[in-house]
């Protein structure tokens, strides 16, 4: 890859991982539409590491509290036996990650062979864009929103199942999990925060899988591309999370819905 391609793809990964517009679609499309070469396993690992570090850094305080509370539920640390909402939230996040892990393990070959196409991306971009818009309109009309404490394990698992569907390119992991969060009555801010916390084990699993594939492969490693890609993905992802949460209550999801509809229609026009 050229340095320009590294910069563009790393920034795309960082910006689109947490916006409801599908990071996988934006990484697949350059190779299919522009004819760029596949970025390779090593680069995939690098940008996953960058985005994972960004979301963990941004939510470091919440993660610290949740980790201590979770350890207390298994009889370890100062919160031993206390429980509380942070402990529940930790368990919800862990359990809600299982569907995506199972779906990814069982369906990865089918997805790679049959669903990584511009047509699939166009259709999922449009379909789940409409659903996001519907959920956002409903959320905007509500006078009261369900606090995250009232989400419950059932609600968390529904969001987790949605995250599994997001393995289909073009769906958007953050987009569909926020959509279900909004449909379940969460505010835009809480739907986004739960989605971002849920992304941590999901990105970690994906990164670990790619790392294992890289170790077992004979692919050469471009350390410059990995380092630059990881750094740019980290910076862009951190900035994206920060400003997205600031602007979300003011702008809602509609700017992203409009973008998805334009992208989906544009892709259909390009390929048909």
From Swiss-Prot:
Transmembrane segments: 1-21, 39-59, 91-111, 117-137, 151-171, 196-216, 228-248, 251-271
Superkingdom in the source lineage: Bacteria
Hydrolase recorded as keyword: yes
Pfam families referenced in this protein's UniProt entry, alphabetically: BacA
GO molecular function: undecaprenyl-diphosphatase activity
Gene Ontology cellular-component annotations: plasma membrane
Catalytically driven reaction(s): di-trans,octa-cis-undecaprenyl diphosphate + H2O = di-trans,octa-cis-undecaprenyl phosphate + phosphate + H(+)
UniProt entry keywords in alphabetical sequence: Antibiotic resistance, Cell inner membrane, Cell membrane, Cell shape, Cell wall biogenesis/degradation, Hydrolase, Membrane, Peptidoglycan synthesis, Transmembrane, Transmembrane helix
E.C. designation(s): 3.6.1.27
Function: Catalyzes the dephosphorylation of undecaprenyl diphosphate (UPP). Confers resistance to bacitracin.
Protein name: Undecaprenyl-diphosphatase
Gene: uppP
């Amino acid at each position: 890859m050229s340095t320009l391609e590294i910069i563009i793809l790393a920034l795309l990964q960082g910006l689109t991982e947490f916006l409801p517009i599908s990071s996988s679609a934006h990484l697949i499309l350059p190779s299919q539409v522009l004819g760029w070469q596949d970025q390779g396993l090593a680069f995939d690992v690098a940008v996953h590491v960058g985005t994972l570090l960004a979301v963990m850094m941004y939510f470091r305080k919440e993660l610290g509290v949740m980790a201590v509370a979770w350890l207390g539920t298994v009889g370890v640390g100062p919160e031993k036996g206390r429980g509380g909402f942070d402990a529940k939230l930790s368990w919800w996040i862990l359990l809600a990650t299982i569907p995506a892990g199972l779906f990814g393990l069982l369906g990865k070959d089918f997805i790679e062979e049959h669903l990584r196409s511009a047509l699939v991306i166009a259709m999922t971009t449009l379909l789940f864009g409409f659903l996001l818009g519907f959920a956002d309109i409903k959320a905007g009309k509500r006078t009261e929103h369900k606090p995250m404490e009232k989400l419950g394990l059932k609600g968390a698992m529904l969001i987790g199942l949605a995250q599994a569907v997001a393995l289909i390119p073009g769906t958007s992991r953050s987009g569909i999990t926020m959509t279900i969060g909004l449909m379940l009555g969460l505010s835009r801010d809480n739907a986004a925060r739960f989605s971002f916390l849920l992304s941590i084990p999901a990105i970690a699993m994906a990164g670990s899988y790619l790392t294992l594939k890289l170790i077992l492969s004979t692919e050469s490693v471009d350390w410059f591309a990995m380092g630059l890609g990881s750094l740019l993905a980290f910076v862009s992802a951190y900035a994206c999370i920060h400003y997205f949460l600031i602007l979300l209550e003011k702008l809602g999801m509609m700017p992203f819905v409009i973008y998805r509809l334009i992208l989906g229609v544009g892709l259909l026009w390009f390929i048909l």
